[in-house]
């Protein structure tokens, strides 16, 4: 039985992201938290039992992304199956790494959404850092102003339109900044309880938001590629969803 409804897939196609809750068991959450805290305490002066050590305003990335209890949040949960329901069964390379992505409390109470976002890559992607679909998994509760992932709905369609326009001269896009796309929507913050997951299109404008809570945002970030990514990564001709089986079928 599929995890995603037709409405889910249509929402992803139109908005470039999809949020789902309750993707992890309590045991998966507990084990993932333990790995993150253990590595954080080994590598920094942060003490999980002393919130005064958590005020480090900004993102941090401890090690542990290849630990089985971290990778299992993707592969042993519904999340990777949902990825395949969008891109295609056996069409996505299973990643062996899910990067811990932390956002420390800022220590201030005034919160505003981020003014700008970015793309992780732009074609022709000569540095080979691109990806097909991204995943963000929260392994602790994240409040609306708690440093959640920010996405600009529909900005992937603007990016794809631009890339199609330059499909035969992608070198012309070198040096372009994501904000040159001028997203037509305001950012939406992804927040929710531990076990919340967000999938997003590789060409969606996104960012991190300011953490005005008293908790470290504990999240995992994953960038996944189509099996034929090296061949198709700069193919922006024709149907932009031709390599997404779950979207092309709509």
Give short role names for the model-derived ranges:
Residues 142-205, 229:
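Double-stranded beta-helix
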Residues 17-19, 134-138, 151, 187-189, ...:
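Conserved hydrophobic/aromatic beta-strand scaffold that supports enzyme active sites
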Residues 112-113, 117, 127, 145-151, ...:
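A short secondary-structure junction signal
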Residues 42-53, 194-199, 203-250:
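Non-heme Fe(II)/2-oxoglutarate
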